[in-house]
Regions:
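Polytopic transmembrane helical bundles with strong interfacial aromatic enrichment
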Residues: 1-143
Length: 143
């Protein structure tokens, strides 16, 4: 089995894991806002923190490491291809979104969240839209 294919498989697994977290955490925030009594708030805080620390953060790091490693193997000049440049921009956007969710998580931990469940429902669509675009870029690889 080649290093390239191994990295590619790990990359796909990491991306799927990261996307699961990016889609699920805002949904947890929705439920947290809508059921914010002291007892359920404690449970949501534990769930949210574990999702971020155990799944999302490692998956994002592995996604970046394997993605950059694959790029290195394919040749750094491939960055000049349109599809890869756009993919990098979108992965940076997902990383920024991840950072924003980390800030929201901190707000919940400190009981200072002031965002509505409607807000979290709305932003929950962001990673889905980016995922759709990235999949089309990877499959069709526009020049």
């Amino acid at each position: 089995m080649s290093l390239y294919l191994t990295l590619k498989a790990i990359h796909v697994i990491a991306v799927v894991s990261w996307m699961v977290g990016l889609l699920y955490l805002p949904r947890l925030f929705v439920y947290h806002v809508e059921n914010n009594n002291e007892q359920t708030s404690k449970v949501f805080k534990i769930m949210e923190k574990r999702l971020m620390k155990i799944i999302m953060n490692p998956a994002m790091i592995i996604t970046w490491i394997t993605g950059l490693s694959i790029w290195w193997i394919l040749g750094l000049e491939t960055i000049f291809s349109l599809w890869l440049s756009l993919k990098f921009i979108l992965v940076f956007a997902l990383s920024g979104y991840h950072g924003f969710l980390s800030k929201c998580l901190k707000d919940f931990e400190l009981d200072r969240n002031d965002r509505s469940s409607k807000f979290f429902r709305f932003i929950n669509e962001i990673p889905t839209i980016i995922l759709i675009i990235v999949v089309f870029l990877v499959i069709f690889k526009p020049a």
